[in-house]
Amino acid sequence: MIEFDNLTYLHGKPQGTGLLKANPEDFVVVEDLGFEPDGEGEHILVRILKNGCNTRFVADALAKFLKIHAREVSFAGQKDKHAVTEQWLCARVPGKEMPDLSAFQLEGCQVLEYARHKRKLRLGALKGNAFTLVLREVSNRDDVEQRLIDICVKGVPNYFGAQRFGIGGSNLQGALRWAQTNTPVRDRNKRSFWLSAARSALFNQIVAERLKKADVNQVVDGDALQLAGRGSWFVATTEELAELQRRVNDKVLMITAALPGSGEWGTQREALAFEQAAVAEETELQTLLVREKVEAARRAMLLYPQQLSWNWWDDVTVEIRFWLPAGSFATSVVRELINTTGDYAHIAE
């Protein structure tokens, strides 16, 4: 299995280094749910600004403040502890009056707004995230500048970031150990993390192999294509290749790669043979996913950061802003720009 740092680059390995997350303020994330609170219902949506706190810790503290069980507080996604982040939490408080959440006190945390809502906020139920990153001690400004220009046109590989695999790859290692036994994993969190790491690693491997081709965005017979921003896909046929290629070039369609699991992967013929060959040696992880009935799915091979802009504060410091859809990783954008240094270079966003 290819280590994250050794995955194929779309724009070639960066020539320079830089410091990511010299302090939390250098990594700002604003969650975009894509909808507004209903204004009524048994749930309360709470928008929180946090610095130096992980999401679960804040959720547990909010539950304690509201005198409800921790499981009654949900969120759409985990946000990094070592960053400044805005995100929504959701507390179920049926039959209770609206509490005064301005009285909620937690170091590094501030309630920005709150309102009633009809539905529970579930994991993954967000549109995306807006990022503002500051890269410091950049050793090669010209290289980073050109890469930013190229990313605007060609995007970046839509890799799952290193944080998906746990500290030191612990989640992937757990999946491999599990794959080698028939012992049930009772811990739901471990089970979820390990299966997710297994499938993500296989996806990354398929994309890395595809990126070795001379023309990464060349549609081949049997490719599974999806409309940009949509989840469903269809299979490319030989007769349609020219027209489909035009639509891929226009970024109307996206070539996808497999998230392997049980059931059909979605590609056919030449494209399916390529994907199967790319992960042919990873039989243990594939068997685990089938055994645990994790359904196969698709994910876009490339990622195009939206609203990408940047501002050089000086020759060694650049502020970069962009928006990514849910499930995408800012660190997968940064790895195409610089070789990152710093203790938190790969921490989750």
Curated annotation (Swiss-Prot):
Signal peptide interval: none
Active site feature: D80
Pfam families from the UniProt entry: TruD
Gene Ontology molecular function: RNA binding; tRNA pseudouridine(13) synthase activity
Annotated TM spans: none
Residues binding substrate, per UniProt: F27, N129, F329
Cellular component aspect of the GO annotation: cytosol
EC number(s) given by UniProt: 5.4.99.27
Record InterPro entries: PsdUridine_synth_cat_dom_sf, PsdUridine_synth_TruD, PsdUridine_synth_TruD_CS, PsdUridine_synth_TruD_insert, TruD_catalytic, TruD_insert_sf, TruD_pseudoU_synthase
Catalytic activity annotation: uridine(13) in tRNA = pseudouridine(13) in tRNA
Keywords: Isomerase, tRNA processing
Gene Ontology terms describing biological process: tRNA pseudouridine synthesis
NCBIfam families: PRK00984.1-4, tRNA_TruD_broad
Family: Belongs to the pseudouridine synthase TruD family.
Function: Responsible for synthesis of pseudouridine from uracil-13 in transfer RNAs.
Name assigned to this protein: tRNA pseudouridine synthase D
Organism: Escherichia coli O6:K15:H31 (strain 536 / UPEC)
